[in-house]
Amino acid sequence: MFKPQQCALLVSLACAGQAYAANVPEFAGDPVVVTAGRVAQPLSRTLADATVVTREEIEESGAQTLQQVLSRQAAVSIASNGGPGSASSIYIRGNKDSHTVVLVDGVRIYSATLGTTTIQNIPLAQIERIEILRGPASSLYGADAIGGVIQIFTRKGEGEPRWNAGVEFGSRGTGKLSAGVAGKSGSTAYSLQFSHAQSDGFSATNSRNTDYYNPDNDGYRNDSYAASLTQTLSPGHDLTVRLFQTFAEADIDYTNAWKGQDRSKSRLTGQSVESKNRFNDVWTSTLRFARSQDKSEEFHNGDFDRRTSFFQTTQNEWQWQNDLSTKLGVFILGASHLDQKIASDGTYTKNSRTTNAGFVSYQLELGKHLLQASLRNDHDDQFGGKMTGKAGYGYRFADGWLARVGYGTGYKAPSFNDLYYPDSGNPNLKPESSKNTELALQYRKDGRSASLTLFQNKVEQLIQWAQTNPADSNSWRPSNVDRATIRGLSLEAAAQWLSIDWQGNLTLMDARDDKTGSWLANRPRQSASVSAAKQWEKWTLGAEQQVASRRAGDATNSEAKALHGYGVTNFFANYRFAKNWTATARADNLFNREYETAYGYNTGGLGVFLGVRFSQ
């Protein structure tokens, strides 16, 4: 933590300078990203591997789920245990799904028992923008950010009231409804958005899944809302309240109790109160209290009176961030206090955890040179203190070009299930840690962009299930048994050619267990995505192609559980038939390919979806 004298010195240094205009994009169409440095900055000046997905891009593509949107991004792969509403895992740069932090409007959404986030229950209708940060970010966001951060921003109010609504129907009994309004009246900005989705689904499991195979249709239902209210108390001083909730019900085939246990209910909630105060051209303070809850229940044969499992995580977090913009650069000083508590129908020997953290970050632009550094100390009441850091340097050697190098460390504390799950937890586990190095070359100018990133991440104390006593078949426990090295490169490009908007990416990756030499499960060694969209009068026509190579389906790389490579083609069309009105169409898996992203679990065949959207 910082001493008062050190803070005073930084404040006095800041007040001596002029405002640092780091949040003003240089190039037309240069997206602004917040997640990469905890302050707004143009993507072209960001010393991190980051991507911004806008509302316009989501609507144009007609994507059905958040998993679809994420799977099209470079160095991001998704493994799903079936169709809509099924458990899904995110692998950023080949890191474990528990190595990704997911934020909704700055609020961490997380299951402290599983150690992951139920992204399958976050509907696209609520999303205004998605920011994806690849690489270690523990020095900015604390535990779990070994692989990266995904931040979801819900819709915000500004200007005249803008209404939106949409309806969509399609294959497998799919139906969606959404409606909302956002705007500003005087000194009050507001937004309110509702959505509903349902599907009859398809069988989550296939015959390769000998433990849980149940050839029925696994349906899904999701209801959600998001709301925000911002009151400007005086110029530069805003008070904001945000609410977010999704409620989902799903048929499931992935439980490990018995095959008949096949219904689940889950709820994600997030609430926050934030005071943002710009005291002068130098100092901006943001104080936030956030509360989130992840609740999941499972039931036998759809009988909601016969609950068979229950897990709930409640998180309360205070966070204070101070941005000091000076002619010497941008200083960020912050502190946070996080309380996590779990509840379950099982008995855990410990059900709460407290983490206190202090962090500092620095950003400088000096001529053609860019510098960013951050340092954070997290003190966990179970594991003590953990220091993480990150440093990056960039050189703008030509108009639109940036070469950069970076190094960072990350860590993850074991989940409550890893530590204390009844009869199988291991309270002696140590946190996982990582060291990441990357080199990148990127170009962004006049609506064209390209980047090449080389990365290597070494993860130590990797937690995997292991047999602690070879003579006892019941002695399997989570254990710090492995180290892993993940090397790779990602290539991205976007441009207009022949009056067609092109976007594409390619990822090559070598992700291995250092101890055994085996490939890490569910990580494709090669993957690529390309999309093309053509606007013609009132029409937008487009297509997507996604390919992924062969992958290991388990940690032992057994041939019987291998996941074969695949290629999937999607098509979309939009027709603007009146002011603010658009008819939409999308075909997923146009050629009805059969493939798996997780061993023993199906993906959807050909699906056709038609809709109408109103948007002011």
Question: What positions do the PLM features span?
Answer:
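Face-selective signature of the C-terminal outer-membrane beta-barrel domain
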Residues: 230-248, 265-396, 451-454, 496, ...
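Gram-negative outer-membrane beta-barrel transporters
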Residues: 328, 332, 365-370, 456-458, ...
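Short acidic/polar hinge/loop motifs at secondary-structure boundaries
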Residues: 107-134
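N-terminal periplasmic accessory domains that precede
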Residues: 66-69, 86-91, 100, 118-123, ...
